[in-house]
Amino acid sequence: MTNMRKTHPLFKIINHSFIDLPAPSNISSWWNFGSLLGVCLMVQIITGLFLAMHYTSDTMTAFSSVTHICRDVNYGWLIRYMHANGASMFFICLFLHVGRGLYYGSYTFMETWNIGVLLLFAVMATAFMGYVLPWGQMSFWGATVITNLLSAIPYIGTTLVEWIWGGFSVDKATLTRFFAFHFILPFIIAALAIVHLLFLHETGSNNPTGLNSDADKIPFHPYYTIKDILGILIMFLILMTLVLFFPDMLGDPDNYMPANPLNTPPHIKPEWYFLFAYAILRSIPNKLGGVLALILSILILALMPFLHTSKQRSLMFRPITQILYWILVANLLILTWIGGQPVEHPFIIIGQLASISYFSIILILMPISGIIEDKMLKLYP
């Protein structure tokens, strides 16, 4: 009798995805982040579900309901801080996952990559709306500033903003709809993640060399299941260290003040994971130009397959592009730092230079270096 996991309609899918899946024998720890993102999503959905049992999406009671969760609900403080810091872990894993894809040329799997970009937008939207829910000062003003950006769209902008707000300012209607969207989006993300995996399993995983690994495949279980479990344990160690020892390290103190439409905080800024994009937005004096640059800073990822000029897929054997890649990483760290600084000299000019170099490296320098490296290897006639 054949094994049930190979014949049962449901178990068969799980078997082909996580047990008997042929995987390259040389994928490094950089390939752990896909599974870590899956775990992050599950943690966020579970903690979020328990938070939603006690949260009220009303401007009068939202702030006090979060206080109630932390003070009166059994382990409510733990659930709340796991959810808040879990979002940070989610984005750390996301950035490393995307960075891995850029370094090793995984963007040549077009369908997988494009769904990944869509997932990134969905996660960013979810995180933004989640940040509004506690209804603190930074929640309210963050929502006001970011939604207001849509007013830069010609002709329909103002109408669109008021339609999203559900009134003439960020108010009760806005909070209620943000809660509804914040609740539903993670399930859409989970569905998209399954499609992401579906497309990945059509081609098989990439590997550090960027070469075809069909000749040397190993079963996913036990080799990569045990490797993923180790990654998950390390991630939980970091997450729980944050939650139990430094729960507010990545948050903003202003969010411990209830939202007050009459009092603007001195420095309005989003959570740390949006700061790089926020810095790009602020570095352009024109409102519409800033919004376009903000969207393009993420959407540029979708252009990566078309900007690939080298005959080699991975950066493993491409030292010039490697240097440019690490300059890009440093550049993103500078943008993240600038996004959290006030709009004054010298931060303005640093932000503008970092924004220009961000787009220049991706759109101009990396494609040129790919051609130069091929010429050096005499791959061109």
UniProtKB/Swiss-Prot annotation:
It is found in: Mitochondrion inner membrane. It is a multi-pass membrane protein. Its main location: mitochondrion. Heme b b566 binds at residues 97, 196. A ubiquinone binds at residue 201. PROSITE patterns: CYTB_CTER (PS51003), CYTB_NTER (PS51002). Keywords: Electron transport, Heme, Iron, Membrane, Metal-binding, Mitochondrion, Mitochondrion inner membrane, Respiratory chain, Transmembrane, Transmembrane helix, Transport, Ubiquinone. The chain crosses the membrane at residues 28-53, 82-107, 112-130, 180-200, 224-246, 289-307, 319-339, 349-370. Pfam families: Cytochrom_B_C, Cytochrome_B. Belongs to the cytochrome b family. Heme 1 (or BL or b562) is low-potential and absorbs at about 562 nm, and heme 2 (or BH or b566) is high-potential and absorbs at about 566 nm. Component of the ubiquinol-cytochrome c reductase complex (complex III or cytochrome b-c1 complex) that is part of the mitochondrial respiratory chain. The b-c1 complex mediates electron transfer from ubiquinol to cytochrome c. Contributes to the generation of a proton gradient across the mitochondrial membrane that is then used for ATP synthesis. This is Cytochrome b. It comes from Mus musculus (Mouse). The gene is Mt-Cyb.
